[in-house]
C-alpha cells in the first residue's frame, strides 16, 4: 500500500482537479502516457449535494449524498471508460475518497443531488446508501455545538462535525463495510488507489478496519495480489496532538509541511534561502520519504483553504511556482503529485479571496466545460493545465530518468544559488538571487553536450533551448541571469545531444 502501482519508470501523478471523465480519458491517451505521467488523481466520483448558494462551488463534491458514480464529471459508464482507457496506456487512476462524512447538516432535504437521490440532512437520512441516524456520530461528539471546537482535543477532531459535515460512525461495522463496498466497486473497475480525504478526522484504527476489507487490484492491469495505493490527507503542521505518524500503519500521508516550507524558501521570507535546502526532506522535520506524498500546492491551499497559508506557491505565481515544482521533481524525497487547476476570478477583501468557492469552468446550465486544447498545446476554457507547461512536463520526465539515483553533488553560494545532481543521470541549477550567476560546477554526468529541458528540449538531434557542455572531468559552466524567464537549468542523460 506504500507502492503507488505506477508502471515502472513512471514516478509522478497529476491532480486533474474537477476534470470530466471524458476529458481525462483523452488526456491519458494524447498527453499523459506519451510524456511519462504515472497516474491521475480524480475528483470525488460519487453523488454529491447540489449547492446553489453560492452557485455550484467546488466544495460541493466533498458533500456526499450516495456512492453512485454520478457527478458533474460524468456517470458510471464514463468513469469506467476513463479507467479502462487510462489503464490501457499505462496511466493509473487514484480516487479522492470522501469517507469521514456525508453532506452538511444544513443541506436540507430533497433531491438536489447530482443523480437526483433523495436525502434529508436534518434527520440524517441517506436512503440511497442507505445510512440513517444510527450511522452518524451525533451521540459520540462531546462538544456543545456538535462541531469541532478545539484542535487540541483529538477526540473531538475525530468524533465531531468538520465545518458542519455529518460525521460518519466509522467504528460501526455496517458503516465500515458500506464504505469498503464503495471502494471495492472502484477497485473492481480498475482504479489503482485512493486519496483519503479528511483522514485526520478519522481514527487511524477505523481507517485500518475499512482498508483491511479492500479487494486486491484488478488483474486485467495489475499483478496478482497488488494492493491499492493509499495516501491519507493529514494536515500536520506541528503543535497539535494528531500527528502524521499516527497514520503510518495505514500507508502514506500527505506532507503539508513540504509546500508550506518550500514556498517560504522560494519567496525568501523570514530570512530563508535556498542554501538551507541542502538537507531538504526528513532533515526539515518531514515524515520519512517512503511515507510521504508531496506537492507544491493542492486544490485546497492554492485558494487559502486547508494548510500552509500565504506562503503556498500556485500558478498565479508562475515564475516562482515553476522553480518550486522543478525543485520538487528533481529532489528524491517523497512521491510527487503535480497540480492541474482551473482559473477563477480571484478577488481579495481584507486579505481573503471572497471568490475562493468558485467551481470549475461551467456552462449556463451548471455543467462543467470541456477541456479544449489550443494549437500551442495549452488549454482553453479557463483550464490552467500546469502539467502541460513545458518546464513542468519536462521535469516529470527528468524525475523518471533519474529514478533510483542518489541525491548528489550539492553546491550553493550561501544564498539563493544552488545546484544538485541525481547520481550520473541528471543535474539541476537554480538562481533565485537578485544578481547574475556564472559558475563552473561538477555535475557527475558523462562528458558531452546536453540540452536544458527548462528553456527548451531535445527534438531529434537538435536542442530548442540552452546547450550545456560537460567536459571530461564532469564539470560544466552555468550562466543564469536573474532576469531569465525561468532562472533555472536542468539537464539529464535523456536530453544528451
UniProtKB/Swiss-Prot annotation:
It catalyses: Endohydrolysis of (1->4)-alpha-D-glucosidic linkages in polysaccharides containing three or more (1->4)-alpha-linked D-glucose units. It is found in: Secreted, Extracellular space. Its EC number is 3.2.1.1. GO terms for cellular component: extracellular region. Binds 1 Ca(2+) ion per subunit. Binds 1 Cl(-) ion per subunit. It is an enzyme of class 3 (hydrolase). Ca(2+) binds at residues 100, 158, 167, 201. Keywords: Calcium, Carbohydrate metabolism, Chloride, Disulfide bond, Glycosidase, Hydrolase, Metal-binding, Pyrrolidone carboxylic acid, Secreted. Chloride binds at residues 195, 298, 337. The modification Pyrrolidone carboxylic acid is found at residue 1. The record marks 300 as: Transition state stabilizer. One of its GO terms (molecular function) is metal ion binding. Pfam families: Alpha-amylase, Alpha-amylase_C. SMART domains: Aamy (SM00642), Aamy_C (SM00632). Its cofactor is Ca(2+); chloride. GO terms for biological process: carbohydrate metabolic process. Disulfide bonds join 28-86, 70-115, 141-160, 379-385, 451-463. The active site is at 197 (nucleophile), 233 (proton donor). Monomer. Belongs to the glycosyl hydrolase 13 family. This is Pancreatic alpha-amylase.
Amino acid at each position: 500500500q506504500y507502492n503507488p502501482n505506477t508502471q515502472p519508470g513512471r514516478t509522478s501523478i497529476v491532480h486533474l482537479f474537477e476534470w470530466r471523465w471524458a476529458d481525462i480519458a483523452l488526456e491519458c491517451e494524447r498527453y499523459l502516457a506519451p510524456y511519462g505521467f504515472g497516474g491521475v488523481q480524480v475528483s470525488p466520483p460519487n453523488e454529491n449535494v447540489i449547492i446553489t448558494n453560492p452557485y455550484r462551488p467546488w466544495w460541493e463534491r466533498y458533500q456526499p449524498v450516495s456512492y453512485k458514480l454520478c457527478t458533474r464529471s460524468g456517470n458510471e459508464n464514463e468513469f469506467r471508460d476513463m479507467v479502462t482507457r487510462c489503464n490501457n496506456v499505462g496511466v493509473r487512476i487514484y480516487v479522492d475518497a470522501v469517507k469521514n462524512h456525508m453532506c452538511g447538516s444544513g443541506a436540507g432535504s430533497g433531491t438536489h443531488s447530482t443523480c437526483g437521490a433523495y436525502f434529508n440532512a436534518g434527520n440524517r437520512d441517506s436512503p440511497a446508501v442507505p445510512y440513517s441516524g444510527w450511522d452518524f456520530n451525533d451521540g459520540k461528539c462531546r462538544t456543545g455545538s456538535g462541531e469541532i471546537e478545539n484542535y487540541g482535543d483529538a477526540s473531538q477532531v475525530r468524533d465531531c462535525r468538520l465545518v458542519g459535515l455529518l460525521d460518519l460512525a466509522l467504528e460501526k461495522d455496517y458503516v465500515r463495510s458500506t464504505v469498503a463496498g464503495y471502494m471495492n466497486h472502484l477497485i473492481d473497475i480498475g482504479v489503482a488507489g485512493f486519496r483519503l480525504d479528511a483522514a485526520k478526522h478519522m481514527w487511524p484504527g477505523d481507517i485500518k478496519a475499512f482498508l483491511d476489507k479492500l479487494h486486491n487490484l484488478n488483474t486485467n492491469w495489475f499483478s496478482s495480489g497488488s494492493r491499492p495505493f493509499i495516501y491519507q490527507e493529514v494536515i500536520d503542521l506541528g503543535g497539535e496532538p494528531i500527528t502524521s505518524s499516527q497514520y503510518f500503519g495505514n500507508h502514506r500521508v500527505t506532507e503539508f509541511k513540504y509546500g508550506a516550507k518550500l514556498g517560504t524558501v522560494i519567496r525568501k521570507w523570514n530570512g530563508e534561502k535556498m542554501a538551507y535546502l541542502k538537507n531538504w526532506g526528513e532533515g526539515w522535520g518531514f515524515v520519512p520519504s517512503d511515507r510521504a506524498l508531496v506537492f507544491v500546492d493542492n486544490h485546497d491551499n492554492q485558494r487559502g483553504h486547508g494548510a500552509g497559508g500565504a506562503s503556498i506557491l500556485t500558478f498565479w505565481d508562475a515564475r516562482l511556482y515553476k522553480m518550486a515544482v522543478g525543485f520538487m521533481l528533481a529532489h528524491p524525497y517523497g512521491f510527487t503529485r503535480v497540480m492541474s487547476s482551473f482559473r477563477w476570478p480571484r478577488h481579495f477583501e481584507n486579505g481573503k479571496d471572497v471568490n475562493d468557492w468558485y467551481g470549475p469552468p461551467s456552462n449556463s446550465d451548471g455543467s462543467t466545460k470541456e477541456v479544449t486544447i489550443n494549437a500551442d498545446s495549452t488549454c482553453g476554457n479557463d483550464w490552467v493545465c500546469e502539467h502541460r507547461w513545458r518546464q513542468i512536463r519536462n521535469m516529470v520526465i527528468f524525475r523518471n530518468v533519474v529514478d533510483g539515483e542518489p541525491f548528489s553533488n550539492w553546491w550553493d553560494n550561501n544564498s539563493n544559488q544552488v545546484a544538485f545532481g541525481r547520481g550520473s543521470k541528471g543535474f539541476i541549477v537554480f538562481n533565485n538571487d537578485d544578481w547574475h550567476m556564472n559558475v563552473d560546477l561538477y555535475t557527475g554526468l558523462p562528458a558531452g553536450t546536453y540540452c536544458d529541458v527548462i528553456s527548451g528540449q531535445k527534438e531529434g538531434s537538435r536542442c530548442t533551448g540552452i546547450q550545456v557542455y560537460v567536459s571530461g572531468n564532469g564539470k560544466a559552466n552555468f550562466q543564469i541571469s536573474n532576469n531569465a524567464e525561468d532562472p533555472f537549468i536542468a539537464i539529464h542523460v535523456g536530453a544528451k545531444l
